[in-house]
UniProtKB/Swiss-Prot annotation:
It is an enzyme of class 2 (transferase). The RNAP catalytic core consists of 2 alpha, 1 beta, 1 beta' and 1 omega subunit. When a sigma factor is associated with the core the holoenzyme is formed, which can initiate transcription. The keyword Disulfide bond does not apply. Its cofactor is Mg(2+); Zn(2+). Mg(2+) binds at D460, D462, D464. One of its GO terms (biological process) is DNA-templated transcription. Belongs to the RNA polymerase beta' chain family. Zn(2+) 1 binds at C70, C72, C85, C88. This is DNA-directed RNA polymerase subunit beta'. GO terms for molecular function: DNA binding; DNA-directed RNA polymerase activity; magnesium ion binding; zinc ion binding.
Amino acid sequence: MKDLLNLFNQQRQTLDFDAIKIALASPDLIRSWSFGEVKKPETINYRTFKPERDGLFCAAIFGPVKDYECLCGKYKRMKHRGVVCEKCGTEVTLAKVRRERMGHIDLASPVAHIWFLKSLPSRIGLMLDMTLRDIERVLYFEAYVVTEPGLTALERRQLLTEEQYLQARQEHGDDFDAAMGAEAVYELLRTIDLQSEMTRLREEIAATGSETKLKRLTKRIKLIEAFLESGNRPEWMVMTVLPVLPPDLRPLVPLDGGRFATSDLNDLYRRVINRNNRLRRLLELSAPDIIVRNEKRMLQESVDALLDNGRRGRAITGTNKRPLKSLADMIKGKQGRFRQNLLGKRVDYSGRSVIVVGPYLRLHQCGLPKKMALELFKPFVFAKLQRRGLATTIKAAKKLVEREEAEVWDILEEVIREHPVMLNRAPTLHRLGIQAFEPVLIEGKAIQLHPLVCTAFNADFDGDQMAVHVPLSLEAQLEARALMMSTNNILSPANGEPIIVPSQDVVLGLYYMTRSLENKKGEGMAFANIAEVKRAYDNRVVELHARVKVRITEVVTDEDGNKQNKTSIVDTTIGRALLAEILPEGLPFALANTELTKKNISRLINSSYRQLGLKDTVVFADKLMYTGFAYATRAGVSIGIDDMLIPDEKKGILTEAEAEVLEIQEQYQSGLVTAGERYNKVVDIWSRTNERIAKAMMDTIGTEKVVNAKGETIDQKSMNSLYIMADSGARGSQAQIRQLAGMRGLMARPDGSIIETPIKANFREGLNVQEYFNSTHGARKGLADTALKTANSGYLTRRLVDVAQDVVITEVDCGTTEGLIMTPIVEGGDVVEPLKDRVLGRVVAEDVFLPGNDEDPIVTRNTLLDEAWVAKLEDAGVQTIKVRSTISCESAFGVCSRCYGRDLARGHLVNIGEAVGVIAAQSIGEPGTQLTMRTFHIGGAASRAAAVDNITVKTTGSVKFSNLKSVEHANGSLVAVSRSGEISVLDAHGRERERYKLPYGATITSKDGDAIKAGQTVANWDPHNHPIVSEVAGFIRFIDFVDGITVIEKTDELTGLASREITDPKRRGTQAKDLRPIVRIVDAKGNDLSIPGTDLPAQYLLPPRSIVNLQDGAAVGVGDVVAKIPQEASKTRDITGGLPRVADLFEARKPKDPAVLAERSGIISFGKDTKGKQRLIIKDTDGSEHEELIPKYRQVIVFEGEHVTKGETIVDGEPSPQDILRLLGVEPLAAYLVKEIQDVYRLQGVKINDKHIEVITRQMLRKVEITDQGSSKFLNGEQVERQRVIEENARLAARNELPAHFDPVLLGITKASLATESFISAASFQETTRVLTEAAVRGTSDNLRGLKENVIVGRLIPAGTGLAYHSNRRRGASGLTESEMQTLAGTPAAVEAPVVEAEAEQASED
């Protein structure tokens, strides 16, 4: 028995480790693993099924086939344990050792390891400084390589063909050594002196000036450094001994009929052994060189195939033409070891079945079929049957259960009571896809699911299936109950809003119940209390929708937090009064005294959660559901064809539109508009028409005429079934109703362009053949899109999870003072997202002061902003707040609670150990399937609003300019001469209410600080022309204006005025190639004037197609227009939307034609153009210049003499995130990414909290590039984890040495995942071969910090409850006793007490 215990303890010893290291295996190491050499290719004797001696399954090498029994049967049973049979050589032990004992093959000739040879960049190639092509020629015996030049003129590593070799041999005899094949490469690698090579390279780096050379040298230095540090030897990349996998990992299974199913590896090994043995024999016979060479090459190829089949040449195929699965294929890809077995496992104690609705369940319950429950809880039932004495042995218990005796069901009830089970619906896109419930036993075979959790699971009852899992250990049950119970997951982790919200028929019922209608039975009655209302309704004295007065008593909390009763008489309806019955105490009736649409119900549950807490809300949600179902049944809403009312105006509107289209067609035929304009205008007309019809239809369906109590006929909201469904938010939308009863409208072709003939009919009228055909186009594409979308969205989620998986909350406060400055998001004058929504649940980074009061802050640093605080700030009129953000968090690993802020799913500051990275990834990835897949072609109305030509304010207040550079015109108005200028309207409190961009050349009619009224116009401009404005007064002088060459004179037929148009330089011919038409402004004497504040001459280079209306010598004043450039109706450019856009942003891809940003602040001027480019110069204040060459086809939007600030756009386009980071820094980049990604989601109506996007951005920015290495060990241009540089710099600072300087680098999520410190995590993500090769050469250690690595090695993850376990484990390593360790780990020794202890410790740490 003692031996047995020793055996168990022995196995336990290996379990505890802190890191995993990967390195190259030396031949000695491989031999030390091995239990013997495999000499024969035989596998098993197909008659006796016994393994052959010395073969691939040999029992002497790998261990016995049966437990404690040798092959020949001489020794059997436990008592001979450890004996080696002298007859068959087998050790008597467990057969399980055949899974762990390895063998080896001694290769007759060295073989290069294909991974280090072919996986790019080739490590052997870098080490030898030879090209892969050359090494392959040597390895595959096409050329000789000089290994030792001796005193000859040959170079080491020089290649010689057969002829050159023979010639050299004749010349020099034996003075030099040259060889071919892997031996030569082995020799070259063995003789490298790493240390001196290193020194030589460092000197070369210092001396070289060429970029490409530097790159190559840096790569080599890194590789050699890696070898030196890891203790690997270069020659180990060429193998002399090949390890053989344990046989049970490459099984050979006899099938019936004398055939065998075998693992491909056996074929590959057999090939290697055959060739190796043949080569050995040939060498012993000293066969001719050419034969030996061929055999060596074949050996090399067979080892290549074994390690990584198909990487070089054609893959070796098996009997059925399918490539054999090599060792590398075993670990990579979705079916490989990592993703199939280590990251995803099949679990015991689980079952699955179809789900049906369980409308009588409480929120924390689910219905579990009895049969299923009995099977799942079998061991528990057995144990209890034994304990009760109903069965003496497990066997007897089993019989009882199989017979399904009556007492079994009673015991099952007891076992199941308060034992939660977990339900999961695939695909699990976010953490709410698995939740815990208490099972309720039901008859039947389907699982019953509570309707309110359907949103979270994204489940419906059209045949969906769900899986059930049983948490077995006490800790698991505890976590399931405390963390995963459906009642603890009321709020969505993505946006902090309730996710347990009624939908569909519940909403319909509640909406029907709370509608109010004119002149219903009982209108105007007054009731003393709700009970009286109920009696009146039950006795049919009143109708549900009648407007009545009711005396209602509510519980309100006063300032001091005391509860008081408040009674008031409320105007309400019968239905709403009945609803008041189920309102929890403390929730004001006013919230329910409205029409309960889905939005209002969500608001109701939200307020309940914030004001009353979890328990009351859960009860309330259940009651709402029951009530909703009851009244939906009473309402009996159904729709018929007559509910789809077609508006009478439809005919007239269509006739008008057709007339307009005809008119444009005529204009086109008489040549007044181009084909493109005609198409755009037609599409515009039809879009507008569609909107008008839709509006008319909604008015028709949504209102009805009724007679009120006074006998007057009035309009009221109708009770049309179709309308109430859409209005309540239960089902259907205005767009869908429009197609049913309005007109179907314009259809898109599969490529996204719009068919200009709309479908004028709706579904009620029916479509004709042509209309039907037109509509199939888009419909079919929709289906194809959906299929693609799901895959794309899943892949995005996977990349996001991978990049952020190791972001965990590790400490309470990192102490940083940095943060992001938050302002409301304003677009085109509308506040899209107010400040309160953006800062809710964030921690303040700096004290917030009111304007004009710098003494006492309104909010102090480190305050968590909850609903009350946010309201306070809103009232005080605060416009900008600096909040903490994960992007600026300074925690070494993970992030701190304060930088993250509120845990959205719980509503309080986030706990230590919360895996915020994974939550962020899920929150962004989960709605991915709702995003569109398409690229929008912006043409026609699809999205182009009418040209805006002025700014009219919507609110009364005062004007504020920001970033505005303007000049004052002679008539007193201001003219904007900058591009980044903005104008905002402030209310009485100084809060910004609206903000607008001011284009260059806009005329501004009010001054900074002026008071204005709503509806007043503050600025206007010409939308069709881009002006060039003079900033000085003087006289015009034309330069390089040559009629017919650089300018063409035109006379307007109507006005008779002459104007000049600048021609396109491409059409000017050679004599004019140096002419640059410029308008210069001079004083009365003809001297050049300069632009105010600079020494640049006041001159304006005119781009092609600009028009000059002034004559040479004409006088101009400040702010006058010198020339104007006509703007073509905005070019239709493709806008990538939806999922591809989100993916592009997260992958930090550079846009196709990126915007050019100013590299520094200064004054713009233009230099001499080259052939296809224009030269733009920015001259800064100290006179230094920066040049930018810009292709001619790109539109430069700045003019000569204009002042730009660093990072401002000078050429239109989509800015590249890398440029934003480089020129403006991390915070503007974060703001840009957040804004762009949110825009995509907002368009689909998906709410995601900013902080999730920030967490991912933090991970994209975790690398930095060394710009100056200082005294550090880093190399210039190297990319390093930011944390490593900071630690190194701290060390250097302590020794008074030079720190390394660095710039932040933005990596896309795929790149960032592969660049992570943990090689296990990277290898299990993508490019497994490359990652492992790199890691092995470096001798990398994986410290198992992230979640993924720990899942793979099978430990608790360092997040949540696992974080406490790991910190205790580390503490144990530093001096706790074994028993204390067991206690903390919560081993079954004493289950209940230690859990509490560990929890208490966790709490004290917090």
